[in-house]
Structures are given as structure tokens and as C-alpha cells.
Amino acid sequence: ATTVTAPLPQIEQTLTRIADGVTSGMPGAQLLGSYLEGPYFTPEHKGAHDQALFRELDIPELERLQQLARGTLRVVALAPEKPRVLEAIRHLVANDVRVMLGHSAADHDTTMAALSAGATGLVHCFNGMRSLHHREPGMVGAGLIHPHAWLELIADGHHLHSGVLRLCHCCAGERLLLITDAMRAAGMPDGHYLLGNHRVEMKAGVVRTEAGGLAGSTLTLLGAVRNMVQLADVPLADAIHMASLAPARMLGIADRLGSLSVGKQANLLALGNELAQQHIWVAGREIDPACFSPLFSESRVSHGAQESPCI
């Protein structure tokens, strides 16, 4: 479960609730832990995050968040040009927390230094960061050429051109991670929603801020796989790998998830023609998606209610 930049007490409460959900178990998809996306960013490429709530990196603060998460804090995203960033990266990595770099104006060398210090990769590559340039490759260039950097991609047909998806496949191959970056409007009708403290609007499935910038997506992970195949001409096996085994390897849990193998947990989808979903199994039990229809209700449309800091 991914958080969004919010006041620190809300983030603390959310990490606690996610930890409770991991411990008690939830119906449907398996909750593996939390992905802290914010508040350790910089303003230039803030996206839909509220820069007034950005914070400086502080080891005692990170330790408190880890304690509240009770071992379920899986990933922390941060901007690599922040003060004390290398110390923070080393601290998090030493505590088995992955560090992803994004929402940042960092240059190539700063990004490479963070990756060399143990950072894991880039948050939604190309989005929320300095663009690739032939005289300053920036974060994107560093991520593409670093041999161990994992690169997240939002393959929804809006965040990235199909040619960029192909470029990433050519350069990074098995280091690509398909993500949705989906927010609460996913699966819902067009209308106004809240993302953190920001009011956003969805039209034809595309979510934008009042200023016109993209604000997350309404993508599904299966839709991302389908788009990689149909829009970017990526082989199906490669696209499935980007949504299954590659993320499991990035998180260090490929010994039990991410592929079908003796001794691994039986989480799988059965797909039909045009990659249409037919069956779902979680931990070996078939799941009926119809049981979760109450989750997709008009109650998620914004009528002035406060948004949870989960995306």
C-alpha cells in the first residue's frame, strides 16, 4: 500500500493501520507492507504532492516510522539531492528497507551516488524527475545505465509514450517494474476525487490536478501488462515478468512469490483471449471478484470528505 505526502501524524497512523492489515490479513489481494512515497521530496518535480508538507531527512524520524510499521515498511521514496541523503539511504538499506529515488531535480552524478550508496532504483521512471538530455542524462540516464537500478514504469498510455516504453525495455530489460500508480478513482466513474489534500478530476479515466498535471492513474496491473504487449510490442513473457517476478526480486521475496514453483505461494491469474482475466487465486484459494463490488461505490467520490494518506 502506497502513501502520499501528508502531515506526519497522518502518515504515522497510516503505517500503523497497514501493519495491522498485514498482521491480521485481508480478503482479496495480499497486503505485503507499505511504500512511503513522500514526504522526502523536493519541489521542482513534485507532481501532485503538497510541497508545503515536504520534510528533511532525519534518522530518528525514520526510525520512528519503522517502529510504527513493525517490520512492514518495505520501500521509502526520496529525492537524492536532499541533505543527509546518503546517511539515510545506508540506514534504510541496513534495516532491509528499499530506497527508490524520485520527485526530484537531481542530476546524473547525484543519482549515481545515491544508487552506489544502496538506493534500489527510480520511482515511476521519467515522471517526476529531470528528463533525459544528451549533455545531462539526469536521473533517467543514471537509472537506465546503472546495472542494478530497478525502474518503475506507469504503462497507462498517458504517462509514457509507447516509444519510451520500448526504449526502457531495450536498455533495462529485466530491471523493469510495472506499477499502476493508481489512486482512489481507479474503478470509479468520472468525477472529482481527493489525492492527499488535493482535489483532482478524472475525465475519460485520466486524473489531473486543477493545474492540468497528471495525478496518479486509474490503471490496473493487468492493464499495464496488456499495454506493454499491445502498445510497446514487448513479448508477453517479458511483460508478465515485469509485473510478477521482477517486483518480487526487487523486494527480496522471490523465494516465496513472483513465479510458479514448488514451495512458493500459489498467487496466480488465469488469463484468456486478449489477456482477459478469468480466474484469481491467492494463497491457493480462488477469489471471486464479485465479492468485492462494495469497495467500488459512490462513497469514494469526493463530497468534501478528507482523503486518507494512502494513494
Give a label for each model feature.
Residues A1-E63, R84-V93, M112:
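Active-site loop-helix segments enriched in His/Asp/Glu that coordinate
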Residues A1-T14, A29-P43, A69-E81, V97-M100, ...:
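Divalent metal-dependent hydrolysis catalytic cores, especially in the metallo-beta-lactamase
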Residues P7-L8, Q51-A52, K82-P83, D107-H108, ...:
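Short, small-residue-enriched loops and turns at beta-alpha junctions
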Residues L36, L92, L122, M228, ...:
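Conserved, mostly hydrophobic/aromatic
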Residues P80-H91, H108-D109, L132-V140:
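Active-site-adjacent beta->alpha loops and helix N-cap segments on the catalytic face
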